[in-house]
């Protein structure tokens, strides 16, 4: 027991010795002078070179009003409005808060004595320029991803969105800065498959009765190999048939819409063309009605070709020789006797001119008869036409036009009464001729009259005998 008691006493004495030699902790108050080669003890203190003392800093929200010296510590004061100090400092003044946030920014932290104002961009924009305090100075709109592209989960370093192409099985049909690629619709009956920019289109699960007969035209052909009759179509064939059913009405609708436009255009153009033709015809008819009635003054006789005229001459000659051989001679006699009886005395110049013209006409007829007897031994007819053209409404006083036909035969003798033939009046002998009437005579030297069928082969009449008569009258 003795050694144990000794050991307890020894330990107790050692504890008392340790307690007596301990140094109490010292609290250093500012200002104080640091030991050579050492700095101030804590971060809330600073070394004043002028006083060569360690002095206390001002807490956040305050600034240094008076610096320390060898006998007194630093004196601090609170910051004014719209000013702040955020850390322990030895500033002479507080810092100014940032300006108010713009319209495209949102204030996420207000200005106080201990902190600055912080602004952030509103939704749809990103910060293009930041300050050291974390506030945004300039905001810009986020980029938009078009159809076929979606917004990636990560952002660019400046906060702008990143676009990525939609993977197979997904799509994006919008232009947005927030939409991501969405998966395609899952259809039990697929009508139109989807792609990166459009979603899949599903066919109706219960087809209508009108679409059922179309399965005969759009269904896939059966395999050529023989199969049992009781075998039912597999599940792979049904979707293809129903898919074509769903797509058939869409094709027909687009076809009808495409055909209706050309038909309407063609009908409109045709109607416009017919209307224009009708207007042109009406204008032409109105212009024709306005023209005067007397326009054509030249008597035209159709010309018969040589080949047809030769055949017609033979038939005419045979017909005239058999029917009226004596009538032609009588017409010649009547014309001659009428000229002798109606010849006036020499004292009247107009009568003398008519007599000379009648004698010249008889001489010309006799010469034609002699020429025809030596040449072709046939019957020839000479036609002289006097045409009166008048547009006046007064038809009571018009001179009668006369056509004399002379048929010659070398053996015939004139035997006819002068009463059967009338002597034509000259222009001066027409007493009741109205001013509107004009007499035009077909002259051989200006416009030769085409010979008729009976006149083929005859010699043309002597040119200029009407001119000679006109000279004598003058």
UniProtKB/Swiss-Prot annotation:
Highest taxon of the lineage: Eukaryota
Gene Ontology molecular function: tumor necrosis factor binding; tumor necrosis factor receptor activity; ubiquitin protein ligase binding
Region forming the signal peptide: 1-22
Name of the featured protein: Tumor necrosis factor receptor superfamily member 1B
Stored Pfam families: TNFR_c6 (PF00020)
Positions glycosylated per UniProt: 30, 69, 195, 208, 224
Residue ranges, Extracellular side: 23-258
Function field: Receptor with high affinity for TNFSF2/TNF-alpha and approximately 5-fold lower affinity for homotrimeric TNFSF1/lymphotoxin-alpha. The TRAF1/TRAF2 complex recruits the apoptotic suppressors BIRC2 and BIRC3 to TNFRSF1B/TNFR2.
Record's keyword terms, sorted: Disulfide bond, Glycoprotein, Membrane, Phosphoprotein, Receptor, Repeat, Signal, Transmembrane, Transmembrane helix
Residue ranges of TNFR-Cys repeats: 39-77, 78-119, 120-164, 165-203
Modified residues (Phosphoserine): 331
Cystine connections: 40-54, 55-68, 58-76, 79-94, 97-111, 101-119, 121-127, 136-145, 139-163, 166-181
Compartments where located: Membrane
Composition bias type Polar residues, residue spans: 429-442
CDD domains for the chain: TNFRSF1B (cd10577)
Gene Ontology, cellular component aspect: membrane; membrane raft
Organism per entry: Mus musculus
Stretches with biased composition (Basic and acidic residues): 297-310
Entry keyword annotation includes Disulfide bond: yes
Lineage, opening ranks: Eukaryota, Metazoa, Chordata, Craniata, Vertebrata
Record's compositionally biased regions (Low complexity): 324-338, 363-378
InterPro entries on file: TNF_chemokine_rcpt-like (IPR051670), TNFR/NGFR_Cys_rich_reg (IPR001368), TNFR_1B (IPR020411), TNFRSF1B_N (IPR033996)
